């Protein structure tokens, strides 16, 4: 184990979070595609700890199930009653056998902006300074309401954490505050937790009392200052949740732009932590990129588009579109106002145009579905053209069925393809056709009734109407006169 690699990280995630006013446990609320506790776990994993323990309590079945999904290797400890942060850490250590040799880092499960880099700095400072405990602190513009860090003027060691209500005027002038994140000597921590008292207004075991116990025993208490005070912000309500989402989104967009991505309007662009970009990708205003979405080199998305778990190939263009679990080939064109549902796969240079919806459809290279169509449960070959207002009728009321259209086909406007049906390579279909039988390669399919004109119908059925009058005037015009 390296000098700064902790023996354990303990994440405190047992609180109810009543100020969120939500049926969802606080630590499971999402920002930028990851739960609050998920962000904390990701930062903690950067330390490569020997053990990672999450202390759960409120809604523990739901939280534990989520943890198993996002990080199966994590261990959980139960704090059945909310008896304070010191008690929660004690439950975490009991999961590890009670005493841990090495450094134990304690973090809060509702601090999604905390970075792995800051935690590494904390662990490194703790080891280098030989501290019994190291407090992660931050200097904030306004420290009102926070516990102040009081240091020894000569050594810089932390002598006390004074709560705002108990602070003197000189102490209230201090802008360095306690984050609630600590690095401890594991053996000293276990011993000190056994000495924490509950004779306070809340009747709880406070983790901060450990600092005083260790200092009074002659051990050094130090501090590591976070470079960005916003990293230590905890989430207690929806306002703070929104602010954290904005900060993290700005961080993600800045990273993308510095890597060669053009974001036209960062204020209206939202991305998840798992989104990736190729160089020279362009993102237009009003765009949301979610989940594992990938934009290839030179791909262009937006404005007003939402993509989730979607791959966009190099040079592809997506405009005013919603796409989920879709795969868009290189130099393909989508939109405006298209909807790519799960299972959509577009080949290179394919086109899905205005007001087109696709689902579980494979559309080949160079094929075009330009207008007002639904393509579901279908395979279309290369360089075919699907006429406007076409519908792939895939559902018979009980089961879904598949339609296959070959390569180099031309289908007329207002076609219905009633699955299961196959249109062979190079075949054409006439406008207005309802295709219910297979069309052989190279054939023209015409599946519509003959047109029948009933002369004088309007005059008989709608006498005196505007249509009847217009028809009467037209009938009096000499042939050939406009």
UniProtKB/Swiss-Prot annotation:
PANTHER family: BIFUNCTIONAL PROTEIN GLMU (PTHR43584:SF3), NUCLEOTIDYL TRANSFERASE (PTHR43584). Pathway: Nucleotide-sugar biosynthesis; UDP-N-acetyl-alpha-D-glucosamine biosynthesis; N-acetyl-alpha-D-glucosamine 1-phosphate from alpha-D-glucosamine 6-phosphate (route II): step 2/2; Nucleotide-sugar biosynthesis; UDP-N-acetyl-alpha-D-glucosamine biosynthesis; UDP-N-acetyl-alpha-D-glucosamine from N-acetyl-alpha-D-glucosamine 1-phosphate: step 1/1; Bacterial outer membrane biogenesis; LPS lipid A biosynthesis. It catalyses: alpha-D-glucosamine 1-phosphate + acetyl-CoA = N-acetyl-alpha-D-glucosamine 1-phosphate + CoA + H(+); N-acetyl-alpha-D-glucosamine 1-phosphate + UTP + H(+) = UDP-N-acetyl-alpha-D-glucosamine + diphosphate. It is found in: Cytoplasm. GO terms for molecular function: glucosamine-1-phosphate N-acetyltransferase activity; magnesium ion binding; UDP-N-acetylglucosamine diphosphorylase activity. The keyword Transmembrane helix does not apply. The keyword Secreted does not apply. This is Bifunctional protein GlmU. Mg(2+) binds at residues 110, 236. The gene is glmU. One of its GO terms (biological process) is cell morphogenesis. Its main location: cytoplasm. It comes from Streptomyces avermitilis (strain ATCC 31267 / DSM 46492 / JCM 5070 / NBRC 14893 / NCIMB 12804 / NRRL 8165 / MA-4680). It is an enzyme of class 2 (transferase). Its EC number is 2.7.7.23, 2.3.1.157. Catalyzes the last two sequential reactions in the de novo biosynthetic pathway for UDP-N-acetylglucosamine (UDP-GlcNAc). The C-terminal domain catalyzes the transfer of acetyl group from acetyl coenzyme A to glucosamine-1-phosphate (GlcN-1-P) to produce N-acetylglucosamine-1-phosphate (GlcNAc-1-P), which is converted into UDP-GlcNAc by the transfer of uridine 5-monophosphate (from uridine 5-triphosphate), a reaction catalyzed by the N-terminal domain. The active site is at 371 (proton acceptor). In the N-terminal section; belongs to the N-acetylglucosamine-1-phosphate uridyltransferase family. In the C-terminal section; belongs to the transferase hexapeptide repeat family. Acetyl-CoA binds at residues 388, 394-395, 413, 431, 448. Binds 1 Mg(2+) ion per subunit. Residues 260-482 are annotated as: N-acetyltransferase. Its cofactor is Mg(2+). Residues 239-259 are annotated as: Linker. Keywords: Acyltransferase, Cell shape, Cell wall biogenesis/degradation, Cytoplasm, Magnesium, Metal-binding, Multifunctional enzyme, Nucleotidyltransferase, Peptidoglycan synthesis, Repeat, Transferase. Residues 1-238 are annotated as: Pyrophosphorylase. It comes from the Bacteria. Homotrimer.
